[in-house]
Amino acid sequence: LCRRDARPLGPGVEVSGKFWRNTMIPTRKTDEKFYRLFSTFHAFSEHLTKREDNELRDKYDHNAFCYSGQPTDDELRAALAYQKARGDAFLKLEGYEPLANAFGMECEETVTMVLPKGTDISGWKANPEVSIRTPDFDQLEQHELKYYGPLYGEDFTVRNNRHLREKLTYLGAYLGGKLAGDCYIFASDGYVCMDSLLVDEAFRHQYIATTLVKHIAEKAQERGAVLYLHADPEDTPKDMYAKMGFQAVDKLYEYLCTDFSKLKI
């Protein structure tokens, strides 16, 4: 999936160099509009643009430096000094090509997968006993605390969820009167992004995820919109999405540092 070569990302899912050269990637525009719901953007240096969410300054994605090319050592030093001056104990860089010099930071990748228009979704498995509706927000918070609390801390998990749901549409999958799964969606410019899909482990193997995705896909197709999502290329859900017909069209490279002493500059 890198621009330099074609890499398979699942059964029948491959993006060629020709694709990159000849196709604009409209999901990037929708993703930028998503971030602008929460963050301001300002040019920082020749290769860096700073994204800032002053209501949730400890959320890495909302406060990253977006690079358009390889940052120089001086640019990274300036970015580091800027973060320190703000009192932000992290530095995140992200862009659509891998960095030749990552300054000692490890890279994580996120794949954008699109469901092509006209995809037949009638055969997707769904649980007829699952109802899809706006989740009860207390239940939603408890659901996210169960899984994200141990990873990110309870305080951040609650603040993050409340911040996001101010401007995003959350959908809950209910089975037996209980919240079994949830996700949020954002629509713009004929595209619908589905993200943060979370299924309670007590309801695994009951088609909660596919029922949610099918519901969203049906609504998108009714509107003539294109559904897409973001996936970790190493996780099992990516393979499930590929089997459902989603195709990989883009990849984001993300570099994070939370220990400035490890930076190589």
Regions of interest found by a model, annotated:
Residues 2, 12, 17-23, 68-131, ...:
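Acyl-donor-binding surface of acyltransferase catalytic domains
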Residues 15, 20-86, 153-154, 158:
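N-terminal charged segments
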Residues 24-38, 60-67, 111, 121-157, ...:
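Short amphipathic alpha-helix that is part of the acyltransferase structural core
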Residues 59-69, 190-201:
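Conserved acetyl-CoA binding element of GNAT-fold acetyltransferases
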Residues 73-79, 199, 205-218, 243:
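Conserved acetyl-CoA-binding loop-helix of GNAT-fold acetyltransferases
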Residues 85-94, 220-232:
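Conserved GNAT acetyl-CoA-binding A-motif
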Residues 96-106, 210, 233-251:
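Conserved active-site alpha-helix within GNAT-family acetyltransferase domains
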Residues 154-198:
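A conserved beta-strand-loop-helix scaffold within acyl/acetyltransferase catalytic domains
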